[in-house]
């Protein structure tokens, strides 16, 4: 397993992606003195005897309740246990590992007041593959992701459950097996662990990374569909897109043109083709997909910033021995980014479904009805297109912006919330739907190109066809379609379709 060294506040998206894909991480050695000084500042602040939110007071609406020194450890344990109130299925392990790494990098910036041993515990859990069981529902994205992060914090004090080595174990048992002792939380530490946007940000980053792969896969399946329909590559001429000026559109057009370069199928209909213009689902791919690329990059910029921030409250400033209360826990930037990703994922799937519909319609594609040599006796791709339509419509419903919703909590003390967690959690499910649509398009486009034999497509697209045919044979007569669709979906989800053609425009570099 790759082990990264995180420089708090300066971690690139590529490293967050690597952690999501399975890498481990430790903090740079330079972080530890900063952490220690922050914890020392908390002790100096306490010595002043003044009320400081979250250190010697209650929480939320109970902030006016002063807590005595003898109860400070109990206060921090209580907030963790009482706030570990999530429901639903466990969040995916890769997402929670990413959440842990995000929290680790945030705590290491010296504004949260936690002790070195507390941060070491979180680091060791990440390195040893101890992943807290975190229910997926329960956060409204302000004050931070309280419930999900509380489930993480609870495992650090030996409460709750942990995934390790494919097993789901009681936290105390999992810690003991790894040679770790449950923590006794010090002043401010419970609040520091559970206050922050790391759950929402981890889910949004996971969605971004998968959406990037989806985008690149759709460039490939879209180009193959254009070939199957004997579409023109003239709409991908760089002169058209230079005038529009949008960078994503320019890069997308260039990629599509390169994917179709030197195609025999394309050359066969350069002359004497009565069609003047292709349907929008072919002709406007650069405009639609380019806009999706641009908006994904905007979301990536926001999430790269959020991933390197401190979203705790209150914040500790050791140089002045001050604790300042603010609102960095409000995840509105993450909510907006998640909404942008959702829109892009929805549109990528939507235009892909339209290409499938075009291919199965002989009036539009010039191919046999439903891409079967014997229409009537065989139904061919009739129902796979219906499945694609169902998936796309489901994604349209899910794409409704989460950030426009809010509901007051904590007796109206927390009266405006971001809904970032909900907005980010839906992304992986949306990508899964869109992946299935692209898998269907991959099969349909490969089938369509088969009808143009012996003419061949470009070298890149022929590699994709060969890959597809290595898993799914040509459809001559109706057969059980589900296994074919699953095989194609695997080619999309694994990134094999992208690997077959080489470098494509991306989001995270």
Swiss-Prot record:
Q: Which GO terms describe its cellular component?
A: cytoplasm
Q: Which InterPro entries match?
A: Aromatic_Lyase, Fumarase/histidase_N, HutH, L-Aspartase-like, Phe/His_NH3-lyase_AS
- EC number(s) from the headed UniProt entry: 4.3.1.3
The reactions it catalyses are: L-histidine = trans-urocanate + NH4(+)
Q: Where in the cell is it found?
A: Cytoplasm
**Enzyme kind, highest EC tier:** lyase
Q: Which residues form a coiled coil?
A: none
Q: What is the name listed in the Swiss-Prot or TrEMBL entry for this protein?
A: Histidine ammonia-lyase
Posttranslational modification = Contains an active site 4-methylidene-imidazol-5-one (MIO), which is formed autocatalytically by cyclization and dehydration of residues Ala-Ser-Gly.
The answer to keyword Lyase applying to this record is: yes
């Amino acid at each position: 397993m790759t082990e990264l060294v995180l420089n708090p506040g300066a971690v690139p998206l590529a490293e967050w992606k690597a952690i999501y894909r399975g890498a481990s991480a430790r903090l740079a050695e330079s972080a530890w003195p900063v952490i220690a000084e922050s914890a020392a500042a908390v002790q100096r602040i306490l010595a002043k005897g003044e009320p400081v939110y979250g250190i010697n007071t209650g929480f939320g609406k109970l902030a006016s309740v002063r807590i005595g020194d003898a109860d400070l450890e109990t206060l921090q344990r209580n907030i963790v246990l009482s706030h570990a109130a999530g429901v639903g299925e466990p969040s995916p392990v890769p997402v929670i590992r990413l959440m842990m790494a995000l929290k680790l990098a945030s705590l290491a910036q010296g504004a949260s007041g936690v002790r070195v041993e507390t941060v070491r515990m979180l680091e060791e859990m990440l390195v040893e593959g101890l992943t807290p069981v975190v229910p997926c529902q329960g956060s409204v994205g302000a004050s931070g992701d309280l419930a999900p992060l509380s489930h993480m914090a609870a495992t650090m004090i030996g409460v709750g459950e942990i995934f390790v080595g494919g097993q789901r174990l009681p936290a105390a048992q999992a810690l003991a097996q790894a040679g770790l002792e449950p923590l006794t939380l010090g002043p401010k530490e419970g609040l520091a662990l559970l206050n922050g946007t790391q759950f929402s940000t981890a889910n949004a980053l996971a969605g971004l990374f998968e959406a990037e792969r989806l985008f690149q896969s759709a460039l490939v399946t879209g180009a193959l569909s254009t070939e199957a329909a004997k579409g023109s590559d003239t709409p991908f001429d760089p002169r058209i897109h230079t005038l529009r000026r949008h960078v994503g559109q320019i890069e997308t057009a260039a990629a599509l043109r390169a994917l179709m370069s030197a195609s025999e199928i394309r050359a066969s209909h350069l002359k004497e083709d009565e069609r003047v213009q292709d349907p929008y689902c072919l002709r406007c791919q650069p405009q639609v997909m380019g806009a999706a690329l641009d908006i994904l990059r905007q979301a990536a910029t926001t999430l790269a910033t959020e991933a390197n921030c401190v979203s705790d409250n209150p914040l500790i400033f050791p140089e002045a021995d001050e604790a300042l209360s603010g609102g960095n826990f409000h995840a509105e930037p993450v909510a907006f980014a998640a909404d942008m990703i959702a829109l892009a994922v929805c549109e990528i799937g939507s235009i892909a479904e339209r290409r499938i519909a075009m291919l199965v319609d002989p009036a539009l594609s010039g191919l046999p009805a439903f891409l079967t040599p014997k229409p009537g006796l065989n139904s061919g791709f009739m129902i796979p297109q219906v499945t694609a339509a169902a998936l796309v419509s489901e994604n349209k419903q899910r794409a409704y912006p989460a950030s426009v919703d809010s509901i007051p909590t904590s007796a109206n003390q927390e009266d405006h919330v971001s809904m970032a967690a909900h907005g980010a959690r839906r992304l992986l499910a949306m990508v899964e739907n869109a992946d299935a649509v692209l898998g269907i398009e991959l099969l349909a486009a490969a089938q369509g190109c088969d009808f143009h034999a012996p003419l061949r497509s470009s070298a890149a697209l022929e590699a994709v066809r060969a890959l597809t045919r290595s898993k799914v044979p040509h459809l001559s007569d109706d057969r059980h379609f589900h296994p074919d669709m699953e095989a194609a979906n695997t080619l999309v989800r694994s990134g094999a379709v992208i690997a077959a053609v080489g470098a494509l425009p991306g989001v995270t570099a």
